[in-house]
A protein has these predicted regions:
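Catalytic-domain carbohydrate-binding cleft regions of carbohydrate-active enzymes
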Residues: 1-189, 237-242
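Accessory, solvent-exposed terminal regions and/or long lumenal/extracellular loops of proteins
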Residues: 189-278
């Protein structure tokens, strides 16, 4: 299954299992921070939905505290739509190849002893490494309410597995693998890294899932310093015709020496760089 953003039983209730800590729900800054971090994390799960009990979970109910939490969740929501071509293609490969959407680092980096021990980072599809923020930074929950933290730490430690380089999704900064770094983690975002050698299909943020990869208006972001390729799965986005072969697989190939992206017919494809800066 998947996470239910918002959680169940967030308030104190009448039964032994109904023992939440956030009676004021969206009026409690500590709950706003918690919900925001959950929302940012769940952006990188197969199913993304605000579900739970005891309080409203629609984004427009989180505009308090100067709107910083609302803006952070809105940013995550837009990113989810921007990544739909990648997410949809990944889901297609789960059906077609028995691939997995989410994997622990040990699956892809079995020879990296440090990666075997990581339990708070994971791979989402073949290209993205997600690093959720699981510690409070801005508000600490106490018996008297939410205590605002002075000079909060806005970083978290991230391990970059060895065997490839990594790009910071937000800044395009390039890092060699096999090292720990302090990654920026302000309330606006969680650390997110792209594996070197990736071609990431994206689109403009949409109003609904009806405006997805089938629109054909894709942007390919190249994160590479050598030749690489990406196989994009598409179908009509509705019904079960794909089970009878009504789908398309298109391979996009990056030529590092020519700095050109081509499709499987040799046609040049418009792309943008996930530029490296050391």
């Amino acid at each position: 299954w998947t996470a239910d953003i918002g959680a169940f039983f967030v308030k104190r209730g009448d039964y032994w299992y109904w023992d939440g800590e956030y009676d004021d729900t969206v009026e409690d800054p500590a709950y706003l921070e918690l919900y925001t971090r959950w929302y940012q994390w769940c952006c990188f799960l197969p199913i993304f939905r605000g579900h739970g009990t005891d309080c409203r979970r629609e984004l427009w109910n989180f505009k308090g505290a100067d709107g910083v939490f609302y803006q952070a969740m809105l940013r995550a929501n837009k990113l989810r739509y921007e990544l739909l071509p990648y997410i949809y293609s990944t889901a297609g490969k789960v059906w077609l190849y028995d691939a997995s959407m989410i994997r622990m680092l040990a699956f892809d980096f079995p020879k990296d002893a440090k990666a075997l021990e990581i339990t708070d980072q994971y791979l989402f599809g073949e290209s993205l490494m997600v690093c959720p923020v699981t510690e409070t930074m801005y508000y600490k929950k106490s018996a008297t309410g939410a205590e605002k933290q002075e000079n909060p730490s806005k970083v978290r430690n991230v391990y970059l597995p060895e065997g490839c380089g990594w790009y910071d999704f937000w800044t395009n900064t390039y890092y060699e693998g096999g090292q720990w770094i302090e990654a920026e983690a302000p309330i606006e975002r969680i650390p997110l890294f792209v594996k070197e050698g990736s071609i990431l299909p994206m689109q403009q943020s949409a109003n609904s899932t009806a405006e997805t990869v089938m629109s054909g208006n894709l942007t390919f972001v190249v994160y590479a310093q050598k030749d690489c390729s990406y196989e994009l799965y598409t179908d009509d986005g509705d019904g079960y015709a794909y089970e009878n072969g009504a789908y398309t697989l298109e391979t996009y190939m990056w030529n590092q020496s020519e700095q050109i992206l081509r499709d499987s017919k040799g046609r040049e494809v418009v792309f943008v760089y996930g530029k490296a800066s050391k």
